[in-house]
Every structure is written in structure tokens, then in C-alpha cells.
Amino acid sequence: MRKTNMWFLERLRGSGENGASRGEAGDKSSKGPLYSNVLTPDKIPDFFIPPKLPSGPTEAEGQADLGPSTSEQNLASPGPRRAPRSPRLPAKLASESRSLLKAATRHVIQIESAEDWTAEEATNADPQAQGAMSLPSVPKAQTSYGFATLAESPHTRRKESLFHSEHGALAQVGSPGAGRRRAGAKGNGGDGGSREVGGALMSPSRYFSGGESDTGSSAESSPFGSPLLSRSVSLLKGFAQDSQAKVSQLKQSVGRHGSLSADDSTPDTSPGVRRRLSRRATPEPGPESGQAPRGEHTVKMGTRGSVRLLAEYEAAQARLRVRLLAAEGLYDRPCDARSINCCVGLCLVPGKLQKQRSTIIKNSRHPIFNEDFFFDGLGPASVRKLALRIKVVNKGSSLKRDTLLGEEELPLTSLLPFL
């Protein structure tokens, strides 16, 4: 009885193990198609590396000499093979192999033999070294790799270079103050300074020739000695015209400084002395000097402040010009600055002729105008009879009325004392 039970248990155990193995195999077979995109050793495609070709034959000859590739042989062989994972794989492999063959036959580099080159030519074969060897006047240097190169740049040591120190003369000529200082430093008036500046400006060879180079370069190495620059003549003409204009301005300034008397031409060149000399040389304006008579006046506007203005009369054009400068003391300190809208009106009386009004200046207790007012058609007789009325008003905002700050009438003869 015990043997029968043991046999039955062994049969049950064996049937259970067989069923489990069959279930695992079924699961694997059912899960197989789900993971078909996983790359396994049996799914790796064949790769093709094109061979090195000794020469560049034509495409047909190259394909005939090389023969079919390994992948093409595998595709063409009728023997047993694995089923392809994709129906497009054979056509894709064939097209890739053909494109690789075409690329291999097309890109062929011809290399010359190394025995044809000498040691010096092989060292200085690059364009930079060849350019350095073509300039015999510029000093050479050798790099750590044995290549020949220039010890310094051939452009920054020439007279025509913008970085050269002598080109500071152009900057000094461009500023009138520098020209006056250089002219005043000369002991013999201003002729020496003007001749020096004129020579520096009017001799284009100082800037357009390589003969005066510090490195002693020849005409062949100079960039301006090349016949390719056929437009340099027009450049020279324009340069000469600008130079003549600058020289004439410099001569005029030098002549003004040289025309001073012996007692005025002191070595003191401070700004205060120059202002005193100009004030002494300037004549008083009047009818005999040919200048328009003018004068600045401060007009009191009653008890509230004043207005500063400048009057000038041009007899040749019969025109009176009044420049309104500023107004002062018209507003008290407690007044709100946001309500200030100052405006000045001008006219000629009697008759209120040629009424004019200034710009409204806001938010300022001391407004500054600096405006010009012109009164035309005034002969000398009319100027002696008419007067100028000045009316200062604070313009009201929104519904507020204008506020009169001051009004005054001045005869034109008091504004123009030279009439």
C-alpha cells in the first residue's frame, strides 16, 4: 500500500513539473511577438566598410573590380538563411552598399610624393611663411615649429599708418586752440608754425609713400607703391583741398595773434588776459561803428518783481528786435508752483500795434523765456515816437480767470539810448 502511494505521488509530481514547463514555454511563445523590436545577436544586420582604393577608377570599373559585397552575396545566395525581420531590409542594404561604393570612388585624394619637396620648401610651404619670405626688407623670425614669420607687422611702422606717432600733427591742426598754442610758441610770429603745418598737410608723400619708413622698406613692399591703387589721385586732390582750407584758417588765427602791439604781446596767455584784450579792442556800439545799437534792461513791474529784456534796432532793415530773457520776483513764496502759468505780452503803443505773446512757462517762480520778438516797418522817426508795452499775466487753468501780475510802458528811446 505504501509503494502504491509513493508511485502515485511521483506521477503527480512529474505531471505538475511538465505542466509548469509547458506553461512557461507558452508564455514565452506568446510574449515573443511583443518584444520583436529588441535587438538580439541574431538580429544584428551586416555592415559594409568600403575598401581603400589605390586610384580613382570610374564607377563601373570600380564595381566590376571589387565584385559583389558580402551582403550582396548573402542576399543573392539561394541557400538556407534566416527570414528577414522586415520585408524592406534587402532593398535597404543594397541601396546603402551602392551609395557607399559611389562615395568611395568619388572622394579620392591625389597625394604627391614627399621626395619632390626640399627641406626648406616643405618647412615654409604655408601661405603665411611664403608671404614673409616675399618681403626681404622686413626682419624675419623663426617659430618653434621651424616656420619663417615676420618679426613685426609691416604696416604699423610706416608713415602712412594711422597708428604712427607723427600723425598727431593732423589732430593738432584739426583743433584751432592747438594751432594757436603752436603758433604762439614760435619766436618769429606765426610763419614758422604755418609753414610747418602747411608742409605737413600739403606734402602727401609723408603719408602716401613708403620711402621714409623706419624699417627702410622698398617701394615694392609699400602698399601704396602698387599700381592697383589707381584711385589715389582723387584721394590726393580731396586731401589737398581740405588741407588748404585748414591752412587758411590757421593763417588767419596766426595773423590775428601777430597783429597785437608790443605791450599787448606778453607771454601771459591766460583766459582773463585774452578777455581783457578782446574787450579793449571791441569798440562801443553806436551809429558810427556800423553795428546795431543794443542794450539790456531790467523793467520794474510795479511792486511785484521785474522783467529782464534786451533791445536791438537795425536801421538798415527798419526792424526792432526785443529779446525777453527772464522774469523775477513775480510770485510769492507761499504760492503753489503747480498753479504758475506765466506769460508775457508785448505790443507797441499808441495803437496796440503788432501784438505778440510769449510761451507759457509753468511751475517756475522765476521763469526763463529767452525768446525774440520782432517789430518790423519801424523807421527812425517811428522809433522815437512809439513805446513798448509789457504785460505779465498768470494764465488761469480750467475755469479760472487770468491774473494780471504787472504792466509797464517804456519809450523806445529809453530802451535804445544810441538813437
From Swiss-Prot:
Belongs to the C2CD4 family. This is C2 calcium-dependent domain-containing protein 4C. Residues 1-96, 115-136, 151-225, 247-300 are annotated as: Disordered. SMART domains: C2. Pfam families: C2. PROSITE patterns: C2. Disulfide bonds: none annotated. It comes from the Eukaryota. Keywords: Phosphoprotein. CDD domains: C2. Residues 212-225 have a biased composition (Polar residues). The gene is C2cd4c. The lineage of its organism: Eukaryota, Metazoa, Chordata, Craniata, Vertebrata. Residues 303-419 form the C2 domain. Residues 75-94 have a biased composition (Low complexity). GO terms for cellular component: cytosol. InterPro entries: C2_dom (IPR000008), C2_domain_sf (IPR035892), C2C4C/C2C4D (IPR043549). PANTHER family: C2 CALCIUM-DEPENDENT DOMAIN-CONTAINING PROTEIN 4C, C2 DOMAIN-CONTAINING PROTEIN. The modification Phosphoserine is found at S259, S261, S270. Residues 186-196 have a biased composition (Gly residues).
